[in-house]
């Protein structure tokens, strides 16, 4: 009798240890091996294990550690699916549902991620228990979740359903093209108007006056002239009654949107779809389907994404950009000195610390955390964008160099052998020519021979050689500069390689 009670205590202790191991706060993900060990232990002794398991699970759900609660919720679902009807009866009790599950939604100190997970578990248990009328408390808990805590339901936590990929019709493509052309035309008209106003103002600009009163009187007249020019400037291509301004709904097209921000997480396993996280900025490239656009993330990944998962990024006005730049300069010039001063005071001797000054500096610095974090995120994204652009540019330059190298190698490989092996013919047999041709074979290799040896008219083929010829060193250096030129020696045509069929067509030297 006492031995049986001791064995039950050991089994209870081992079950509690297994549950604590499966719901340990150091686990970053659900360990299903530990969870299945708990289920096997309860199934081996359902009478004692069920009550003991629910008791330990309830105590773990009452913990303040969010990680323990998340791991325990996963264990609860596994116990409901694998430990039989007794476990389901214990889970679907009013006390357990009310104290361990529904009460989490009213806890303000609990993170919303845990509340979303509790709502997901309630829905999952409701779908599993709804066929059994004896498990009605779980159905009641789900109805209360939908009615009172709808903000935590699974439909709200997840993103909307992705639209179907429908090919765009010709009308849609034509409409998009017309919209793009209209936006470009309006932009061009606005630019022309600005140039016309600027030109008109410069033409009508009065000469500077010496007196201040005349200058003050001239300024209102100039403003009236500018307003009159603006009012009289026609909009030639805009039909009557059509306004250049667009409603926000009409302006959100591929022609006007350049960047969008993700509203939800999207993890896709399709090769052509883009996966992203909530808050990511996507650069729009083109419209692929009716409700799908193609875009790229900051890290360079490219793919298509549904439009109901994103919202357009509003372009900042020049005033906002100027205000943001002023805030950055103030943060770097003034506030950074306060931070350095506070760090210096905190690292100094504690006996000489002025508590009032530290408190004042701390109170001035704490509100800067939001702005500082925003600027850090901004420049972090900018740095990542520039890194991706740099890597893409390096890849393109490398590809271009490879193509150029392959093109040059192919050109050298396919060059005719006659062009590379042909010696440059001449009728004058001089040592200078022979030594130059032996010392500079590459020069002769590059000489064009498009018209063939002996077939060229005129001296165009010989002019290149004489322009590149090195001055001879074997001549008498003491010869008179105005001496009469010696007549060339007569010599017959020299025989060269019989590879060239027209090598014997060269005329004699006297006939050149």
From Swiss-Prot:
<dbReference type="GO" id="GO:0010008">
    <property type="term" value="C:endosome membrane"/>
</dbReference>
<feature type="domain" description="VHS">
    <location>
        <begin position="22"/>
        <end position="153"/>
    </location>
</feature>
<keyword id="KW-0472">Membrane</keyword>
<feature type="compositionally biased region" description="Polar residues">
    <location>
        <begin position="234"/>
        <end position="253"/>
    </location>
</feature>
<dbReference type="InterPro" id="IPR004152">
    <property type="entry name" value="GAT_dom"/>
</dbReference>
<dbReference type="GO" id="GO:0016237">
    <property type="term" value="P:microautophagy"/>
</dbReference>
<protein>
    <recommendedName>
        <fullName>Class E vacuolar protein-sorting machinery protein HSE1</fullName>
    </recommendedName>
</protein>
<dbReference type="InterPro" id="IPR036028">
    <property type="entry name" value="SH3-like_dom_sf"/>
</dbReference>
<feature type="domain" description="UIM">
    <location>
        <begin position="175"/>
        <end position="194"/>
    </location>
</feature>
<keyword id="KW-0653">Protein transport</keyword>
<comment type="similarity">
    <text>Belongs to the STAM family.</text>
</comment>
<dbReference type="GO" id="GO:0009306">
    <property type="term" value="P:protein secretion"/>
</dbReference>
<feature type="compositionally biased region" description="Low complexity">
    <location>
        <begin position="502"/>
        <end position="512"/>
    </location>
</feature>
<dbReference type="Pfam" id="PF00790">
    <property type="entry name" value="VHS"/>
</dbReference>
<feature type="region of interest" description="Disordered">
    <location>
        <begin position="411"/>
        <end position="512"/>
    </location>
</feature>
<comment type="subunit">
    <text>Component of the ESCRT-0 complex composed of HSE1 and VPS27.</text>
</comment>
<keyword id="KW-0967">Endosome</keyword>
<dbReference type="GO" id="GO:0035091">
    <property type="term" value="F:phosphatidylinositol binding"/>
</dbReference>
<dbReference type="InterPro" id="IPR003903">
    <property type="entry name" value="UIM_dom"/>
</dbReference>
<dbReference type="Pfam" id="PF00018">
    <property type="entry name" value="SH3_1"/>
</dbReference>
<comment type="function">
    <text>Component of the ESCRT-0 complex which is the sorting receptor for ubiquitinated cargo proteins at the multivesicular body (MVB).</text>
</comment>
<feature type="domain" description="SH3">
    <location>
        <begin position="255"/>
        <end position="315"/>
    </location>
</feature>
<dbReference type="InterPro" id="IPR002014">
    <property type="entry name" value="VHS_dom"/>
</dbReference>
<dbReference type="Pfam" id="PF03127">
    <property type="entry name" value="GAT"/>
</dbReference>
<dbReference type="GO" id="GO:0005774">
    <property type="term" value="C:vacuolar membrane"/>
</dbReference>
<feature type="region of interest" description="Disordered">
    <location>
        <begin position="200"/>
        <end position="253"/>
    </location>
</feature>
<dbReference type="GO" id="GO:1904669">
    <property type="term" value="P:ATP export"/>
</dbReference>
<feature type="region of interest" description="Disordered">
    <location>
        <begin position="153"/>
        <end position="180"/>
    </location>
</feature>
<dbReference type="GO" id="GO:0019904">
    <property type="term" value="F:protein domain specific binding"/>
</dbReference>
<dbReference type="GO" id="GO:1903319">
    <property type="term" value="P:positive regulation of protein maturation"/>
</dbReference>
<feature type="compositionally biased region" description="Basic and acidic residues">
    <location>
        <begin position="164"/>
        <end position="180"/>
    </location>
</feature>
<dbReference type="GO" id="GO:0033565">
    <property type="term" value="C:ESCRT-0 complex"/>
</dbReference>
<keyword id="KW-0728">SH3 domain</keyword>
<dbReference type="InterPro" id="IPR008942">
    <property type="entry name" value="ENTH_VHS"/>
</dbReference>
<dbReference type="GO" id="GO:0006623">
    <property type="term" value="P:protein targeting to vacuole"/>
</dbReference>
<dbReference type="GO" id="GO:0046982">
    <property type="term" value="F:protein heterodimerization activity"/>
</dbReference>
<dbReference type="InterPro" id="IPR050670">
    <property type="entry name" value="STAM"/>
</dbReference>
<dbReference type="InterPro" id="IPR001452">
    <property type="entry name" value="SH3_domain"/>
</dbReference>
<dbReference type="GO" id="GO:0043328">
    <property type="term" value="P:protein transport to vacuole involved in ubiquitin-dependent protein catabolic process via the multivesicular body sorting pathway"/>
</dbReference>
<feature type="compositionally biased region" description="Low complexity">
    <location>
        <begin position="215"/>
        <end position="233"/>
    </location>
</feature>
<feature type="compositionally biased region" description="Polar residues">
    <location>
        <begin position="429"/>
        <end position="476"/>
    </location>
</feature>
<keyword id="KW-0813">Transport</keyword>
């Amino acid at each position: 009798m006492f031995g049986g009670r001791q064995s039950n205590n050991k089994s209870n202790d081992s079950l509690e240890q297994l549950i604590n191991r499966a719901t340990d706060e150091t686990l970053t993900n659900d360990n299903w091996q530990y969870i299945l060990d708990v289920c096997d232990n309860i199934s081996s002794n359902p009478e004692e294990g069920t009550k003991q398991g629910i008791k330990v699970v309830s105590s773990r759900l009452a913990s303040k550690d969010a990680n323990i609660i998340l791991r325990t919720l996963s264990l609860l679902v596994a116990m409901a699916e694998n430990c039989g009807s007794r476990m389901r009866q214990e889970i679907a009790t009013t006390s357990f549902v009310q104290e361990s599950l529904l009460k989490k939604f009213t806890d303000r100190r609990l993170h919303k991620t845990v509340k979303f997970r509790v709502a997901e578990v309630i829905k999952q248990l409701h779908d599993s228990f709804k066929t059994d009328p004896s498990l009605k408390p779980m159905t009641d808990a789900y109805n209360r979740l939908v009615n009172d805590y709808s903000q935590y339901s699974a439909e709200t936590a997840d993103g909307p359903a992705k639209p179907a990929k429908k090919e765009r019709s010709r009308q849609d493509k034509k409409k998009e093209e017309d919209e793009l052309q209209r936006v470009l035309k309006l932009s061009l008209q606005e630019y022309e108007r600005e140039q016309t106003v600027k030109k008109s103002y410069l033409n009508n600009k009065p000469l500077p006056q010496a007196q201040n009163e005349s200058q003050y009187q001239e300024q209102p007249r100039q403003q009236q002239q500018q307003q009159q020019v603006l009012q009289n400037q026609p909009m030639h291509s805009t039909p009557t009654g059509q306004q250049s301004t667009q409603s926000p709904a009409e302006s959100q097209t591929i022609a006007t949107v350049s960047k969008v921000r993700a509203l939800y997480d999207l993890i896709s396993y399709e090769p052509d779809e883009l996966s992203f996280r909530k808050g990511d900025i996507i650069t729009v490239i083109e419209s692929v389907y009716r409700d799908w656009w193609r875009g790229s993330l900051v890290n360079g990944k490219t793919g298509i994404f549904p439009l109901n998962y994103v919202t357009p990024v509003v372009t900042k006005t020049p005033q906002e950009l100027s205000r943001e730049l002023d805030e950055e300069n103030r943060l770097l010039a003034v506030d950074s000195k306060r931070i350095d001063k506070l760090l210096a005071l905190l690292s100094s001797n504690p006996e000489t610390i002025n508590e009032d000054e530290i408190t004042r500096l701390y109170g001035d610095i704490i509100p800067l955390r939001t702005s500082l974090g925003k600027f850090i995120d901004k420049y972090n994204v900018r740095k990542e964008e520039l890194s991706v652009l740099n890597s893409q540019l390096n890849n393109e330059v490398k590809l271009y160099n490879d193509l150029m190298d392959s093109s040059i190698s192919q050109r050298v490989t396919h060059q005719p052998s006659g062009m590379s092996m042909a010696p440059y013919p001449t009728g004058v047999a001089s040592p200078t020519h022979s030594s130059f041709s032996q010392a500079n074979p590459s020069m002769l290799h590059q000489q064009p021979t498009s018209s063939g040896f002996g077939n060229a008219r005129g001296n165009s083929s010989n002019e290149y050689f004489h322009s590149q010829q090195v001055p001879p060193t074997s001549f008498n250096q003491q010869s008179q500069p105005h001496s009469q030129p010696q007549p060339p020696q007569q010599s017959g045509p020299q025989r060269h390689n019989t590879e060239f069929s027209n090598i014997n067509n060269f005329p004699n030297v006297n006939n050149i």
